[in-house]
Swiss-Prot record:
This is Large ribosomal subunit protein bL36A. Keywords: Ribonucleoprotein, Ribosomal protein. One of its GO terms (cellular component) is ribonucleoprotein complex. One of its GO terms (biological process) is translation. It comes from the Bacteria. GO terms for molecular function: structural constituent of ribosome. Pfam families: Ribosomal_L36. It comes from Saccharopolyspora erythraea (strain ATCC 11635 / DSM 40517 / JCM 4748 / NBRC 13426 / NCIMB 8594 / NRRL 2338). The gene is rpmJ1. Belongs to the bacterial ribosomal protein bL36 family.
Length: 40
């Protein structure tokens, strides 16, 4: 999982979902887990 300042490029990937957990923004991608990320 990458920690990024901006999730814009990750959320545009095919199969990505933006999720908010414990006040942090995450991108999860079950099709291609390589594109997982957290903002901050």
């Amino acid at each position: 999982m990458k920690v990024r300042a901006s999730l814009k490029s990750l959320k545009d990937k095919d199969g990505s979902q933006v999720v908010r957990r414990r006040g942090k923004l995450y991108v999860v991608n079950k099709r291609n887990p390589r594109w997982k990320g957290r903002q901050g």
